[in-house]
Amino acid sequence: ELPEKNFAVAHALRTRRNALSGCGWHLEPGDGSALAQEAAQRLKSDLDATGMLHPELGRIESFPGLLRDLSDAILPGFSAAEIVWRPGGRGFYGFRPIEQRFFSFAKSYTPRLRTTGHLYDGEEIAHGKIIFHELCDGGDPVRGGLIRPLCWLHCFSQLNMKDRLSFIERYGMPFV
């Protein structure tokens, strides 16, 4: 909600996201072999074909849409998207963003997906199913974003001293 309430934050965030998603991208093969060249070309054609409205799966994001969605990690510190695979493992349709609230870090700094059977702890994420992007260098991914310092900045710029002290006293927030 912070970008909705503070136009300067919204403007800076939009500028950064547009700069990231506006950059060009290309794939390079891992080595000079014909097999690596073919794999890189096949992946590029798969990425170019992503993004559509699937009748059963709903809206599927394209690769530039994935890059834009993963830039959501700027504020909360992490972002994730599901890879929507084609049947039989022959390529993929595209990507579907997953909101941050569906992840749990209760047991460790490794993300776990919250499901109906595992609401608090979450369950382990299957390999090759989710792309997870985090901004922090080790440590807690939830604290890696810009949301905490921006919340303090917003609080100090919008509330007078009396209201801030009243809020801190009422909700027991330590003043750090």
Predicted stretch roles:
Residues 1-22:
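N-terminal-proximal low-complexity accessory segments that begin disordered
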Residues 18, 29-30, 35-176:
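Structured, contiguous alpha/beta core segments that scaffold functional sites
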